[in-house]
């Protein structure tokens, strides 16, 4: 086994899920807002490179999974909720954007 993330103090990474291609995973993190409960979805290659933020909702986004063909992403979020504890399930087309490195 190997470690993919090495986050600073106050950052939590959890709920990883493999893309069907097994080239990368999606997971939930508060990397952008350490010590907060603001969790967004991130994507990282299996070698630990190319970290990319996927969601931007200033709330809680987690428990992401892909459809078998990898074209749909499903996750839990409190976006559009009346309170921070109102969670719903969201589905979106997953479009992989190549980095310009």
PLM feature spans:
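Sequence signature of WD/YWTD-type beta-propeller architectures
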Residues: 1-101
